[in-house]
């Protein structure tokens, strides 16, 4: 990891995906995940005890990209009393009556806490740009507003970790087909 300075251009990192069920040594993967979860739980306790900083984890991905399962698997050993998961779907009528960051700001972590965003404020520039919902001047201005918003969070002691979980179009199609076969996923 490295700190990204204000408005610095960042190149995406190309990492091999972690092993998934049925690939590689599953037992070794689970043992490593358990060890990392223990370490994460220790960090969470220290963050909570210190009460000076907070952590915001932002997960972005296409539909079926693994956001929910990542949250369930990675954070299963963390004390649920000091962690909050916020999922950002299409804005409600009330949320649309406010500026686009209003609903996001309400979910940011207080000191000593961890917030995980399942999707985020980036939807308000990505979706509206791709679907041409707002004029270009609006989404361009939102980029600056997001940068300013995140700078304020960082200045107040919030560390922001951003992850884009990428899957190929073929993997996405496979996951959609798998969902059709699993009643718990058909909602």
Write out the residue ranges for each language-model feature.
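Glycine-rich phosphate-binding loop of ATP-dependent small-molecule kinases
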Residues: 1-187
């Amino acid at each position: 990891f490295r700190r990204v300075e204000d408005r610095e251009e960042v190149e995406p990192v190309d990492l091999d995906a972690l092993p998934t069920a049925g690939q590689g040594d599953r037992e070794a993967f689970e043992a490593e995940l358990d060890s990392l979860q223990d370490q994460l739980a220790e960090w969470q306790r220290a963050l909570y005890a210190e009460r000076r900083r907070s952590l915001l984890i932002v997960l972005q991905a296409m539909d079926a990209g693994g956001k929910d399962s990542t949250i369930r698997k990675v954070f299963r050993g963390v004390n649920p009393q000091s962690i909050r998961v916020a999922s950002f779907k299409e804005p409600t009528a009330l949320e649309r009556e406010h500026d686009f960051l209003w609903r996001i700001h309400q979910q940011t972590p207080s000191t000593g806490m961890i917030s995980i965003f399942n999707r985020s404020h980036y939807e308000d520039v990505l979706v509206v740009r791709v679907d041409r919902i707002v004029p270009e001047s609006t989404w361009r201005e939102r980029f600056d507003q997001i940068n300013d918003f995140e700078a304020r969070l960082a200045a107040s002691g919030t560390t922001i970790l951003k992850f884009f979980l990428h899957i190929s179009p073929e993997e996405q199609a496979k996951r959609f087909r798998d969902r059709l076969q699993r009643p718990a996923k058909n909602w």
